[in-house]
Amino acid sequence: RPDIVSVHNLYPFISPAALFECKKAGVPIVMTIHNFRLICPTGLFMRDGLPCEVCLERGNEWSCVRYNCECSRLKSIGYTLRNVYARWTGAYRKNVAAFACITDFQRQKLIAAGYEAERVTVIPNGIDAPASYDLTGGNYVAYIGRLSYEKGYDLLIEVARRNPSIPFRFAGAKREQSDMEIPGNVEFMGYLQQEELSDFICHSRFVVMPSRCYEGFPMAILEAACYGKPTIGPAHGGFTEIIGR
């Protein structure tokens, strides 16, 4: 019999119904919060390219259907009903003993949504620092992450267009098709394995994370810090407490 159940992202493979079975068996649950899905059906707190907290402000998830936040009416309804089920049954509030957020920003949002403050704590992400690394400098601006709209990679491409003398390199898998015209100083590296990613960071000048969404606690910030590379990010979400103002 386990002493504790550690839960991370339940969706899309595990139903919140599993939490009731753990509670029935008398095993306490600690849930690590990686996004905002307990409050916002999409998990992003984002609508029309901007941060959105309407579901938090109204105390329910139906705005996801109203604004079609998943850009598919059927998908938006499905995501909303999933959250409605969890809220009506108390799947999280009744069964989870403690919530471990990765930033204080997340913690404050859960508390604002009605979760008891004494059950919500902060355990930031960590990383194993490399024993040694090569810091022979590079001259390019580095982007690390999915090439998708919420990550704001297109914003950085526009910055590259305005600064043709500076090289920009993007490491990450494409998640969407784009007809953007790519300037000559932009290079796509594709998905990089860990050793390749370490070299990519080491040889950059700095890392930029232009996310439109709040994000959780991006590991890329820690990876860059391990190699003495600063990260530039937006002044919203947990970025200000991770990077500093």
Question: Which role does the model predict for each range below?
Answer:
Residues 105, 126:
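Carbohydrate-associated surface elements
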Residues 178-198:
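Nucleotide-activated donor-binding/catalytic signature segment of Leloir-type glycosyltransferases, i.e.
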Residues 202-216, 229:
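Acidic donor-binding loop of glycosyltransferase active sites
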Residues 221, 230-233:
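Short hydrophobic beta-strand element within catalytic cores of glycosyltransferases
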Residues 198, 221-226, 240-241:
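Short alpha-helical segment that forms part of, or immediately flanks, the ligand-binding pocket
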Residues 144, 166-180:
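Glycosyltransferase donor-sugar binding loop
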Residues 100, 134-151, 157-161, 169:
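Conserved donor-binding/catalytic core segment of Leloir-type glycosyltransferases
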Residues 24, 37, 52-98:
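Membrane-proximal helix-turn-helix segments that form the acceptor-binding/catalytic region
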